[in-house]
Amino acid sequence: MRTPSFGSISRRRSRIGSGHVFPAAVLVLILLCCFASRGQDDAPVSAADVPPILKIGAQAPDFNLMGVDGKMHSLADYASSKVLVVIFNCDHCPIASMYEKRIKQLTSDYQGRGVAVVVIMGNDPKAIHLSEKGHTDLGDTYPEMKLRYEYRHLNYPYLYDGDTQAVALKYGPTATPHAFVFDQQRILRYEGRIDNNAREELATKHETRDAVDSLLAGKPVAVQDTPAVGCSTKWAYKEAGAKAEVAEGDEKPVTLEMATAGQLTALRKNVGTDKLLLVNFWATWCGPCIEEFPELQKMVRMYAKRQVEIVTVSINNPDEKKFVVKFLEEQHAINRNLLFSGSDSADAVKAFGTNWTGGVPYTILIGMNGEVLYRTQGDMNALDVRRALLKNLPDDRYIGQHAYWNSVF
């Protein structure tokens, strides 16, 4: 008997018993609430509603989805291929990202051999907690998919199913990545993992490739299903948890400390710590500072469990503290926030050093040995900052992400 991967739960449906009679107004209200909460009436609203995995021997469900190329893709577009490989993957999951290169290689290796590889992003982007983005630069929205595709020079059709999850509901992927291999008649012959280890150098079994090779050779697939191990599919019902996490963070206290020139010098050295240090200098009178601040706060929550401290330093005058506090509270800035205690901002510039000319915003990433890893004078490009962070963060929970962010493919 198959051992299901974590997150795969058979669908159950509840019914209102025939003996219950509801006033028409109440019934209409219930229906309106249901449709308002989700546009698709089959979308899971709880873990009990998660669809089952498509069964071996089933026909490939049709799809009509927008790709990152701006075109619609359907099952019929791949009718000429002898074998169709459909893989559910995403951007935010560290395990999923570690498979991008292998999926790209799979696509390349079988090009011209009658094999089509199609990748579908089936997560609900709004169901992803900020804390689940601690190893990524991006979420799972359509625009973010395009950014990842271009950044990694990917070569396969990458399709978006995040708004309704209509296709994911038909296939029932439990995790990312989750592969489905269909024969020429589009009968499912294999579903499960791509191989047996997220770290490519440790993978010894390659079930997806084996299934493709067997079908091309006209042979039965020996291993028909395996557990798909990775980040669980983010079904719509998980939106509530993502919102609750934000609300919980918003309730944390906002603090502001006064910092002397000497304290800024000590901050710059970043000694006696096992964390990277990201510092953003700003002021309430600086338009670009105000504009980019929400992105900075998003990073605070994304990387809260990683080895990095994010600090903001306001160069407002000390008697403007109340304005600084007000803004920080509006932004729910729960990280460490400083206000330079001197009345001459040039003293702050001199104390911190690092060739800062004094203009704000000024953002700098400092390593664990005090080395400057990244800096930008002027408007911050949040994507560049995140990638600089990820490239320099050590493997603090498991092995593989440091190599991923420092690889080129």
Describe the residue ranges of each PLM region:
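Bacterial N-terminal signal peptides
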Residues: 23-34
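Conserved redox-active cysteine motifs that mediate thiol-disulfide chemistry
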Residues: 90-102, 281-298
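Short, internal strand/loop/helix patches
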Residues: 137-182, 188-189, 325-360, 368
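Thiol-based oxidoreductase modules, predominantly thioredoxin-like and allied folds used
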Residues: 114-139, 154-164, 307-321, 333-345
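Short pre-active-site segment immediately N-terminal to redox-active cysteine/selenocysteine motifs
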Residues: 82-84, 89-92, 275-277, 281-285, ...
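A short beta-strand-turn-helix
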Residues: 63-84, 255-277, 297-303
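N-terminal secretory signal peptides that target proteins for export/translocation
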Residues: 1-18
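Thiol-/selenol-based redox modules, centered on thioredoxin-like
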Residues: 183-256, 359-409
